[in-house]
């Protein structure tokens, strides 16, 4: 009986070790993978700037990029794309087997307080895949969701700019500068010295890529990718929001 129990304990321990080693191997592979920066193409009609009110926030299209700001505030945007903002791919064992990095933006649709951006991603195999990126004000922030028409693409990448001298704290911090930082499944992100806060949610491991100066890229599992953007006056406000969102996603 004791021998059976010991065998069971050793079996569980080895299984746990295997999971840890597999996760570490995946993280190592993912951190070496080049980022999914995309090139944005828009039709001539989209050269006209436009603004969309989202509760206490405003999403502005400047003709070449997006900027999310606190409405009526002179503070810099809390999220700004500066060009391509969405990429996707098919990932296996921490490596991208297919990359989709040519992006088109073809429509804005505002229904109630939900703004949807729709377009296509051109992948390395030459095929076009439709996407929908939505912004909706929720609980004092803006929730971002990504939808892809092709279930073959299991990873999405959301990209944005970071201000000069903007320092990060939270799950990632300044020590992550110049690295691709693998985050745990669940809710994770950062608060910055500029008062900009980001939280991402994924049921699988996710990552924040800080290898390129002044730019950030978040990668997550397509089927569960959600993100929240909001202004936070200090790290304590960010931590409180993080805890609330973590509890909400577990319901």
Question: Where do the protein language model's features map onto the residues?
Answer:
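Hydrophobic alpha-helical membrane-insertion segments, chiefly the h-region
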Residues: 17-27
């Amino acid at each position: 009986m004791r021998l059976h129990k010991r065998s069971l304990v050793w079996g569980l321990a080895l299984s746990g070790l295997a999971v840890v080693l597999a996760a570490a191997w995946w993280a190592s592979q993912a951190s070496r993978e080049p980022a999914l920066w995309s090139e944005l193409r828009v039709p001539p009609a989209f050269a006209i700037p436009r603004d969309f009110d989202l509760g206490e926030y405003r999403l502005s299209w400047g003709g070449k990029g997006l900027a999310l700001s606190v409405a009526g505030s002179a503070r810099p945007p809390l999220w700004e794309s500066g060009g391509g903002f969405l990429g996707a791919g098919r990932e296996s064992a921490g490596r991208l087997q297919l990359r989709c990095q040519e992006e088109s933006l073809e429509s804005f649709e505002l229904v109630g307080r939900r703004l949807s951006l729709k377009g296509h991603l051109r992948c390395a195999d030459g095929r076009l895949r439709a996407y929908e990126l939505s912004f909706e004000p929720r609980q004092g922030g803006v929730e971002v969701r990504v939808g892809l028409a092709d279930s073959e693409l299991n990873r999405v990448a959301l990209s944005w700019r970071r201000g000069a001298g903007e320092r990060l704290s939270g799950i990632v911090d300044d020590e992550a500068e110049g690295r691709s930082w693998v985050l745990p499944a669940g809710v994770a992100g950062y608060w910055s010295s500029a008062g900009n806060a980001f939280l991402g949610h994924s049921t699988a491991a996710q990552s924040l890529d800080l290898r390129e100066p002044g730019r950030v890229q978040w990668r997550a599992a397509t089927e569960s990718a959600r993100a929240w953007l909001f202004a936070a006056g200090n790290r304590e406000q960010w931590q409180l929001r993080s805890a609330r969102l973590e509890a909400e996603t577990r319901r």
